[in-house]
């Protein structure tokens, strides 16, 4: 019974992240929504790893790998956003065309 609740929470987080990623015009908000999506995926990895075979740690190891990738994205993403803001004076996604200049 606990599996359904965790999967429902994960689906809810994933849906919020996808909705925010599709509708956001701000790059910082898009990065935050991407983090929500990655956290929902991590929750699924850990849940299914524990539910199907709690002796093996494959889901947990994969989750740690995704967390490290998300940490790198969280470090590099704002640096790219600040660089774009310095050059273009805007971080709105629909106003950026990096191939123009």
Curated annotation (Swiss-Prot):
Keywords: Chloroplast, Membrane, NAD, NADP, Plastid, Plastoquinone, Quinone, Thylakoid, Translocase, Transmembrane, Transmembrane helix, Transport
Main location: plastid
Catalytic activity: a plastoquinone + NADH + (n+1) H(+)(in) = a plastoquinol + NAD(+) + n H(+)(out); a plastoquinone + NADPH + (n+1) H(+)(in) = a plastoquinol + NADP(+) + n H(+)(out)
Annotated localization: Plastid, Chloroplast thylakoid membrane
Biological process annotations from GO: ATP synthesis coupled electron transport; photosynthesis, light reaction
Enzyme Commission code(s) on record: 7.1.1.-
Single GO molecular function: oxidoreductase activity, acting on NAD(P)H, quinone or similar compound as acceptor
Listed InterPro entries: NADH_UbQ_OxRdtase_chain4L/K, NUOK/Mnh_C1-like
Gene Ontology CC annotation, any one: chloroplast thylakoid membrane
Topology relative to the membrane: Multi-pass membrane protein
Membrane-spanning parts: 2-22, 32-52, 61-81
Function: NDH shuttles electrons from NAD(P)H:plastoquinone, via FMN and iron-sulfur (Fe-S) centers, to quinones in the photosynthetic chain and possibly in a chloroplast respiratory chain. The immediate electron acceptor for the enzyme in this species is believed to be plastoquinone. Couples the redox reaction to proton translocation, and thus conserves the redox energy in a proton gradient.
Subunit field text: NDH is composed of at least 16 different subunits, 5 of which are encoded in the nucleus.
HAMAP family documented for this protein: NDH1_NuoK
UniProt similarity note: Belongs to the complex I subunit 4L family.
Identification of the protein by name: NAD(P)H-quinone oxidoreductase subunit 4L, chloroplastic
């Amino acid at each position: 019974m606990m599996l359904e609740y965790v999967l429902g929470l994960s689906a809810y987080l994933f849906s919020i992240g996808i909705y925010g990623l599709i509708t956001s015009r701000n790059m910082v908000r898009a990065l935050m929504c991407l983090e929500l999506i990655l956290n929902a995926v991590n929750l699924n990895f850990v849940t299914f790893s524990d539910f199907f075979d709690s002796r093996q740690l494959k889901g947990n190891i994969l989750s740690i790998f995704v967390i490290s990738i998300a940490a790198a994205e969280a470090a590099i993403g704002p640096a790219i956003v600040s660089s774009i803001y310095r050059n273009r004076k805007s971080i709105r996604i629909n106003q950026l065309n990096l191939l123009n200049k």
